[in-house]
Curated annotation (Swiss-Prot):
Gene3D superfamilies: Ribosomal protein S7 domain (1.10.455.10). One of its GO terms (biological process) is translation. Belongs to the universal ribosomal protein uS7 family. This is Small ribosomal subunit protein uS7. One of its GO terms (molecular function) is structural constituent of ribosome. Pfam families: Ribosomal_S7. The gene is rps7. It comes from the Archaea.
């Protein structure tokens, strides 16, 4: 009788299992991709069409946002190493799967309400609108990356430590972290424009 051999699961960075991660926010669950891959590098396959970045692994989207600063521009291997080291720090501090911490951070850092400018006879009037789920995810990842950059640029704190602290604080909903503070600010402005 032959034994069935199941294919080994592909773990992110050969360590983290994405299948055990649950996304608690149902609004963004469709746009946070958790397909398993060893190295989060899609080689630009998902950038040619408009909404295909929803199919990109959320970790790779974070890596791509970290590459946008002038120090890390185009250095994907450096950004991958930063995220891998930050995930190790997150796991040491929280004893949780860091991908789940990242998903919670994205859910807590994305603004639910924003403002747009409407022009009435030469006068700009702010109007509050609900944020689309894909924009929530994009904005959250961008705010997390901006918070990491502001916490580590021209400072002695390593980038991996800054990313780990930002992810943990955003996952807990701490208003002292950059991304959640910016989300609160945007929602406060939107609330005043209702």
């Amino acid at each position: 009788m032959s034994e069935e051999v199941s294919a080994p699961a592909r773990l992110l960075f050969n360590r983290w299992d994405t299948s055990e991660v649950t996304i608690r926010d149902p609004g963004i669950a469709r746009y946070v991709n958790l397909n398993s891959m060893m190295v989060p590098h899609s080689c630009g396959r998902l950038t040619r069409q408009e909404f295909h970045k929803a199919n990109m692994l959320i970790v790779e989207r974070l890596i791509n946002q970290l590459m946008r600063t002038e120090v890390n521009t185009g250095k994907k291997q450096l950004a991958i190493r930063i995220v891998r080291d930050a995930f190790e720090i997150v796991h040491q501090k929280t004893k949780k799967n860091p991908i789940e911490v990242l998903c919670d951070a994205v859910a807590n850092a994305g603004p639910r309400e924003e403002t747009v400018r409407l022009k009435y006879g030469g006068i700009n009037v702010p109007k509050s609108v609900d944020t689309a789920p894909m924009r929530r995810v994009n904005t959250a990842v961008g705010l997390i990356a901006a918070g990491v950059y502001s916490a580590s640029h021209k400072k002695k704190k390593p980038v991996a430590n800054a990313l780990a602290e930002e992810l943990i604080a955003a996952a807990n909903g701490d208003v002292k972290c950059y991304s959640v503070a910016k989300r609160e600010e945007r929602e406060r402005v939107a609330k005043s424009a209702r």
